[in-house]
């Protein structure tokens, strides 16, 4: 995987691109990566006691073995494409917080190869909008936790020397109610108040 990432970085650098992304590599799915980044991992996978990578693939493809028998997360079409993404599950006990280092490790890996990249992460609005809620809580109940997590993400990238961060918000193409717009604006007002000089691209 590292060899493939290095080859891709070199090709993009040699092509003269102004903005080269990082964190665009995934072993399975970008939404699943974001779920693990934000600690949105159902207990049925955590309780298997697997290695981090095996736990990731249990969520992606299910697990049948000596440690248990669980189905994978549900899949849905990514908007109007033939790509399918893994649907994050959020229940009333989910503690949404920054819990993984993948985006930061890949940014540092690119720096070690002489490339200062623009990290790319699925944005908070799209993540909450596409998640499946199991219980009584809705996306609004996770406002504080998810904004805190993205502020932490920004802070870590500032410390690492990043200049740009790209937050992908494809859910903005959908018809949005007044409440949706207000929720989106509230998310980004809080986050952008704490960007510490980092340039944010949507």
Predicted regions: what is each one?
Residues 1-202:
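Domain-level signal for soluble alpha/beta catalytic cores
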